[in-house]
């Protein structure tokens, strides 16, 4: 016997449930290139000074001073007489020394 239509249904099925959660993210990409180099450091201190050069030659001598007026007048007046007395004194002293040494 055929069952009655009371229990036979031809209804469509209920809709499907929501989808599951997404999977985990993939691995990160490679790192970017390095940045530019920093500026150079400061200059070091200067070296010590070298030795000094040799001294230069001395300058020329200065001019002679003026003659004393007393000596120049005396020489002009008594020049030949002074030379005569000087010669006589030297001769006397020499004779005295020779006499005292040898006698």
Curated annotation (Swiss-Prot):
Residues 1-11 have a biased composition (Polar residues). Residues 14-65 have a biased composition (Gly residues). This is Uncharacterized 9.5 kDa protein in DHFR 3'region. Residues 1-70 are annotated as: Disordered.
């Amino acid at each position: 016997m055929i069952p009655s239509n009371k229990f036979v249904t031809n209804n469509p099925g209920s809709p499907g449930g929501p989808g599951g959660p997404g999977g985990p993210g993939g691995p990160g990409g490679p790192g970017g290139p390095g940045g530019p180099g920093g500026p150079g450091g400061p200059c070091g201190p200067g070296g010590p000074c070298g030795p000094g050069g040799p001294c230069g030659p001395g300058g020329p001598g200065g001019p002679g001073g003026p003659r004393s007026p007393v000596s120049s007048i005396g020489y002009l007046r008594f020049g030949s007489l002074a030379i005569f007395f000087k010669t006589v004194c030297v001769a006397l002293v020499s004779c005295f020394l020779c006499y005292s040494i040898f006698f």
